[in-house]
From Swiss-Prot:
Pfam families: RIP
Protein name according to UniProt: Ribosome-inactivating protein bryodin II
Enzyme class: hydrolase
Similarity comment: family membership: Belongs to the ribosome-inactivating protein family. Type 1 RIP subfamily.
Transmembrane parts of this sequence: none
Amino acid sequence: MRSIGFYSVLALYVGAHVTEDVDINFSLIGATGATYKTFIRNLRTKLTVGTPRVYDIPVLRNAAAGLARFQLVTLTNYNGESVTVALDVVNVYVVAYRAGNTAYFLADASTEANNVLFAGINHVRLPYGGNYDGLETAAGRISRENIELGFSEISSAIGNMFRHNPGTSVPRAFIVIIQTVSEAARFKYIEQRVSENVGTKFKPDPAFLSLQNAWGSLSEQIQIAQTRGGEFARPVELRTVSNTPTFVTNVNSPVVKGIALLLYFRVNVGTDNVFAMSLSTY
């Protein structure tokens, strides 16, 4: 496996025209690192149509209602099995998925999600929520740092969700899909790491995991920095690939340039008060 440094970023953002009335689709059949990147970039584009940018980073919507609150993503594995995953457009959370004539909703999915998504088929409420702590517990008390990622693991996750195998396989599948779809949409580094593992597997490194944990704080401080000449009100602690602490203190950091989506925060002009307009991150 080729090692990628923590500060590796993809400088080039390629936007693609995405029709607003269709799902985003990704099939592993014939997939390459390039087609995976195109899928992730199309998803980012769809999630941020008409939204502002802060330091040239697209900001997610601060609110949405009804079906507009959710983006559907259809994933197909190497065996041709497909599931359709529903993402919350405000924070890129996975809230539910459909396999055949059954839709499965995470325990913390909203009533609105249950009311508007996957109408006309059987709905099942899962006994665990969509945050990492709950999923890791349901997956057999395994930390996501010990769960391998890569195209083969995405394929297996889709298959387990499609068949909804009992036990720990589905919550483990959620952990794989969340990191390779939602987290990859948020961070170019995560997108890059996944795209490199078409025929191989890898376990998330400390940098990979610390970015996931700090997305909310990074989004907050980047938006506060607009009122502070680019400086953060509080440093954000991350980890390098070798697990050394490192701190991000302003928008000139290469870490900031590697962020692809920001969670929306409303900043009180003239103060450092910030009001989160969505749920906390995974």
